[in-house]
């Protein structure tokens, strides 16, 4: 059985342009969740988040595989060129694994955020507030308007 092709939804706002895979759920905190199988989710930062953070300098995890996690828990941290941030859990369940490829090639974080630059996987239930790509585009437009100092919806 082959996977259906992923449609990348283009979005352009101000000077920021991105493509968003339509096979994922997105959170207001700029994480994506990809359902890999029954209850197993891969988590990563959106391209918007990686651009705001800059190049990955260092990262770490505060939980081990098999640990119970809850929505909003801090599971790790990312230090990037422009900022440092905690990694929050966009779901509830069991932490499965971290992406060890980032240890050997940290450029994957911002060069391939929807592919090989994923952060970790978990088993459980995703954030009930996560949206489809259209909902995330609306959130992203609002965030960019705030950064640009414009009321939402102005061009």
Predicted regions and their residues:
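Non-catalytic terminal segments and appended small domains
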Residues: 1-74, 85, 97-155
């Amino acid at each position: 059985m082959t996977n259906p092709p992923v449609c990348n939804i283009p979005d352009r706002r101000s000077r920021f342009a991105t493509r968003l895979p339509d096979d994922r759920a997105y959170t207001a905190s700029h994480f994506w969740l990809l359902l890999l199988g029954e209850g197993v989710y891969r988590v990563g930062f959106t391209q918007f988040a990686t651009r705001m953070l800059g190049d990955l300098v260092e990262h770490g995890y505060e939980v081990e595989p098999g640990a119970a996690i809850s929505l909003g828990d801090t599971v790790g941290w990312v230090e990037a060129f422009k900022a440092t941030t905690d990694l929050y859990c966009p779901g509830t369940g069991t932490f499965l694994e971290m992406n060890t490829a980032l240890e050997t090639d940290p450029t994957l974080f911002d060069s391939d955020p929807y592919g090989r630059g994923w952060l970790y996987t978990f088993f459980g239930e995703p954030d009930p507030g996560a949206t489809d790509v259209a909902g995330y585009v609306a959130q992203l437009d609002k965030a960019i308007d705030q950064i640009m100092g414009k009321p939402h919806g102005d061009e």
